[in-house]
Amino acid sequence: MSGIAGTSQDTSVAASASSSSTRPAAASSSIAPPSPSLTTAPVKEQEQDDDDDQENDDEEEEEEGTAAITGADGLTAKQRKKKKSKAAAKLRKKLGLGGSPTDASEGKLLASGSSREGKISDEVVSQVQRAVQAEHGSVAANAVTKANLAKVMAMMNLERDAMLKSQDSKQKAQKAIADHKFWKTQPVMKPTDAPVVKSDQEGSIEASVPPEQVRQEPYPLPADFEWVMIDVDNEGELKEVYDLLSANYVEDDDATFRFDYSPEFLHWVLKHPGYQKTWHIGVRVASTKKLVAFISGIPHELRVREKSYQSTEINFLCVHKKLRSKRLAPVLIKEVTRQCHLTGVFHAIYTVGSVLPTPVSCSRYYHRTINAKKLAEIGFSAIPHNMSMEAHVKRFELPAKTNLPGLREMERRDVAQVGKLMRRYMRRFDMAPRFSDHEVEHILLSGRGEACQGGRGRKGQVTWTYVVENSEGRITDMFAFYSLPSSILDSDKHQSLNAAYLFYYATDVVFQGDCDCDSDSSGVCDAETGRASTSQPSSERAVALAAGKAAWQCNSLTNLTSCELADEARVAAWDSEPAHIKTALKTRLNLLINTLLIIARDHDFDVVNCVTVMDNALFLQQQKFGPGDGFLRFYLFNWRTKPVAGGMGARPGEAELDPVQAYARSMAKRAAHTDDDDVKRLAEQLIRNAAINPAEVGSGNGIVMV
């Protein structure tokens, strides 16, 4: 479980900085199901690439002046340059990227949608026809011609340009944030850093230190304000946080929707197992004691590829609208960082929509219409041209009832099985949380609410979790979603958008043929509960702490028991699974998510939202999710690593915003000007992976931000 934090558009510098902000589902006319990408749009080079170009130009000037000088390899500088150029061209040709300026210009012309029909070869038309026939049959394939293919490409280019223009305007408004001196002083990856090439280069940017080396006094606040620790078990104080967020928290760009966090939701998120009361920080007006700002952190164990560490998720950064000129947000960030350091945690994860130094992953929001009529009435989605409301509603109809044998709500007796299934499934991703059984019970069951007498549903329910149990009593699948409504700020007819957000899911189809997937992975597990025996050490970290080791010295030690840790053994990575496993996974996930949509409809949700993390790309199109105009960027505080694929690239223009794509371009440039075999191999691998449609493989990001 991850947190959201953020503020409205005009919140000062660091209001976005350390906030984990999933913005409210914004109104979007692009709610229609996505079309498969037919071509790769030309990619804009980023500022870092421009810097590289300048450096390369300088190198070329030097080479001209020293062309006659022979090196140890017997070649002149000019000959070496020519050799490297040929090698780069060979690499590009091998990867299907085009080998000459002519190839590049042809690609740009085709991708622009303005090309004449003659620019589209018969081979391209045949390839598209075969792809369409495989998905939609021969009738649809026969309709593919050069003329309508050119029109489709033009439409895709319009979508790409509109999306990039929207993102560009937002980025200009946020440029002051990214350039602010605050980030220059923080242990975060910078655009000017050398790219991470080897695994041993991944890790902490700054070392952990003992508490006595951490600042002991709170950071100073402007006059008339004072710090306060919020007790979330105190109903009055929790209500104050709720009121502050309700009136001042994240809105969409058009100020039409605002998240409406319930007290039950806040209780569920903020009281994560192992939470620290000192990480729930508020600012009051000294004279009136009115709460005017808040920030919080949630403890989690985070795994990034092969390394795991204790971290904090920064959430709910909010400053009262009337006080945003006081620059409270940067001070809030520094204070919550100080409090985390005092308790021995020196790493964090946070998300925002804007680009800061430096995203480790980026994903896009998708929305699945449930109540089509209401969404159209409030401006959340648009009815396609020349389509009636009745036809629009019919597009999103779902089956009358679920049809999945063994489906039922999750119960506490399922925690051990669900925990094991989740740990195995999440181990597939490059970046993911590590949940103990205790945490699984909290995130999936503690938000169930209380049963309503004589009625369906539960009072204060936040989470809905379901499992699929086979005839042998084994849980083969699980999925969950949570409720996060948004207030509608400009509608006379509707006051609330009842939104469900896709949470975690897992299925055992990815472990076909794995003889260990159905049995305990360790002999220390209790046969009845599946948890570690009480006679065994609880976890590496717990043992170290019990032995007197300080918390700051235990950041790399796991909270998982030996039994739980063994659940992650021998699991293939998401991008190395064979095609037949991906096919089975796609089929199963489409069935599970379709079932989830029916349940969401039956509980009166208007829309189901998600981002392109986990394996979501495998079902988005078939389940009629449409792309929104929001993007969620993931950031790691005090951790250096290669970017993580966030499921971007299926839609026009997404590649330009993807950190993985930018990293691949950067490494390709570097590979063309180096003899380092490691760099060349990594560049080739990155470029090849970047060309794969995420709808075929999913993503490497296993984090769901709440």
From Swiss-Prot:
GO terms for molecular function: glycylpeptide N-tetradecanoyltransferase activity. Keywords: Acyltransferase, Cytoplasm, Transferase. Belongs to the NMT family. The active site is at V706. Residues 1-119 are annotated as: Disordered. This is Glycylpeptide N-tetradecanoyltransferase. It is found in: Cytoplasm. Pfam families: NMT, NMT_C. Residues 78-95 have a biased composition (Basic residues). Its EC number is 2.3.1.97. Adds a myristoyl group to the N-terminal glycine residue of certain cellular proteins. Tetradecanoyl-CoA binds at H180, K181, F182, W183, L317, C318, V319, S325, K326, R327, L328, A329. It comes from the Eukaryota. The keyword Transport does not apply.
